[in-house]
Amino acid sequence: MMVLKGWDGYSLRLTLYPSFSLSMFKLDEDVYLKYLGLCKGLRIYDYGYDVVVLGGYCDIDYVRELCGVLEDPLNYVYEVELRFNDVYYYLVTQWRGVGLSTATRDFDHVFISIFLSKRTSYHDRVLQWVDSLFNIIDNPVDLINIDTSNLFKPPQIRELSGVFKEYFYNVRPYVVRGNINDVRYNLLRIKGVGPKITYAYLLHAMRFTEIAPIDTHFNYFIFNVLGLKYGMPKKELCLKYDCSKCNSNCVMKELRSFFGKSLGYLQTVVYIHVKMLCKKGRCYECVLRKYRLCKLKS
């Protein structure tokens, strides 16, 4: 047994909830069991503001990464442009429980769960689909030798084996080398993989926090709470240009400029904030409302 230190307010449950790492865990009462990928059999649970770790040997740094305690998100407030500094600070302060859980040593599993999350609910469907899939296969590599289009009805799973083969041969070698630009470019070349999937992968499988997927929650936050009026990333432009060299009116370019390495942390906290407060009309609990930092009209 070992205990990993968190920070005041840290919560394993809140940290895993928005993460694609969650797809490799099963929750049994208050204990998370890692049943897929590296460190299978690992058991972790909240212990105050720390995490108790039980089970077989696993590199402590990777366990800390999975638990989201590598870095306190508040440490990245210095990355944020002055005009949004208070937004980041107060948002992270309100959700002190949320860390950034990534899985850089389980990148194949992360790709699967991210691709399956396309146009559907992660918690309501994808977690079940992943479980069903790994009742049939033992490892992600097995997808190279099977045709999922004959095994499942949901279109995401039907497409998975074909997409995974392209990923395995054309993207994975660059992942192993840690080459962000080549991973980004070759992911975008895959049919059915757009900027959202690509940027989610860079964040959750490679821990590249200077970029983040613009999911429905983040999109709501950007346009309604921050009041930013820019266009969404377009695959054809992302294939041609790096953000720094793109002249389009794209929100991703601006977000990277405004938030730097804090962007991935921001998107993770925003997922919880929008889902728990904004979408439920609980503005009276929002710290951004309290300090008049939200652009959304009452």
Question: Where would I find each of the regions flagged by the language model?
Answer:
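Catalytic cores of DNA base-excision repair glycosylases
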Residues: 135-298
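Intrinsically disordered, low-complexity, charged terminal extensions of DNA damage-control enzymes
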Residues: 1-104, 223, 229, 253, ...
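Active-site-proximal helix/loop capping residues that flank conserved catalytic or ligand/cofactor
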Residues: 14-17, 22, 114, 158, ...
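Basic side chains
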Residues: 34, 40-43, 119, 153, ...
